[in-house]
Amino acid sequence: MEENKQKALSAALSQIERQFGKGSVMRMGDSTVSRDIEAISTGSLGLDIALGIGGLPKGRIVEIYGPESSGKTTLTLQVIAECQKMGGTAAFIDAEHALDPSYAQKLGVKVDELLVSQPDTGEQALEITDMLVRSAAVDVVIIDSVAALTPKAEIEGEMGDSHVGLQARLMSQALRKLTANIKRSNTLVIFINQIRMKIGVMFGSPETTTGGNALKFYASVRLDIRRIGSIKKGEEILGSETRVKVVKNKVAPPFKMTEFDILYNEGISRESEIINLGVQLNLIEKSGAWYSYKQEKIGQGKENVRLYLKENPQVAAELEQQIRTELLEKKLSVLASSSEDLFETIDD
């Protein structure tokens, strides 16, 4: 009986391959199936670690949402900068018509190489996104934002006209079409979203994101970004303290949280993260206000240590590598070995 089943399965597989092409269906244990997910760094060491794979996954949809001025666009511009450092191509679909090239340049984005589109309608924005994805030549596409993807019927209609559920239908239709193309081209597509309040909610959070429920389902990673405080030097505000929660993660364990500093005109402070994580892992010793590395004092107060690491990039790079090895690479090797065991079990 088992032999007959095996023959029937082989016949079905060969028929599928003849009809739909080679690779239409395959065993997960086949070496041709990629088990490793490529990632693009977020520019934040803590967030890369919280995401579990060292960044945002390629070939997937990511949603970043939060209140106004919480750092959503800054985070995506940092992702573009990291992508360009790796020699990749990035596109920014500016539906809000609010992209500031000089600010992007300060964050390390090569603005001359960045593809930018300012579409007139939501349909146009999503069609451009689909065409860029299908080209398989773009590594990252950012859509800023879902709330600004206004359907054509709404733009061409009168001010007071009712268009119930039009944007949600548009998003649902577009994502059905986009998902397969994104996987095939291995492009990272990031949707920035805004928060709205649901009326009449008695229990639970009244917060919701715009554009219906489709994006919640199709996104492999959802990040909730919030501003939790200000960074001050006397009376002057230098930046904001930011918290990011990984609300959904299909590629690693979810619900991890991280905090980092966003400095105005500079972006995410890599040095501040190195200090915080270095102290946590005892790579940097903290005694009172003094910080030491390899028995040598490197500064009094966090701000002085940050300046020291900025002036000594080789020390910062050395510390970052130690932190990545300790918190990320060890976890990834454990995950890889456990997945190898799983695939071996499937093959058996």
UniProtKB/Swiss-Prot annotation:
SMART domains in the record: AAA (SM00382)
Binding, ATP: 66-73
Pfam family, any one: RecA_C
PANTHER family per the UniProt record, alphabetical: MITOCHONDRIAL DNA REPAIR PROTEIN RECA HOMOLOG-RELATED, RECA
Matches recorded under PROSITE patterns: RECA_1 (PS00321), RECA_2 (PS50162), RECA_3 (PS50163)
Protein name: Protein RecA
Molecular functions (GO terms): ATP binding; ATP hydrolysis activity; ATP-dependent DNA damage sensor activity; damaged DNA binding; single-stranded DNA binding
Family, similarity comment: Belongs to the RecA family.
GO cellular component, one term: cytosol
Its biological purpose: Can catalyze the hydrolysis of ATP in the presence of single-stranded DNA, the ATP-dependent uptake of single-stranded DNA by duplex DNA, and the ATP-dependent hybridization of homologous single-stranded DNAs. It interacts with LexA causing its activation and leading to its autocatalytic cleavage.
Gene3D superfamilies in the record: P-loop containing nucleotide triphosphate hydrolases
Any one of the GO BP annotations: DNA recombination
Keyword field contains Lyase: no
Organism: Legionella pneumophila subsp. pneumophila (strain Philadelphia 1 / ATCC 33152 / DSM 7513)
The entry's keywords: ATP-binding, Cytoplasm, DNA damage, DNA recombination, DNA repair, DNA-binding, Nucleotide-binding, SOS response
InterPro entries according to UniProt: AAA+_ATPase, DNA_recomb/repair_RecA, DNA_recomb/repair_RecA_CS, P-loop_NTPase, RecA-like_C, RecA-like_N, RecA_ATP-bd, RecA_C_sf
Residue stretches in coiled coil: none
Subcellular locations according to the entry: Cytoplasm
Cross-referenced NCBIfam families: tigrfam_recA
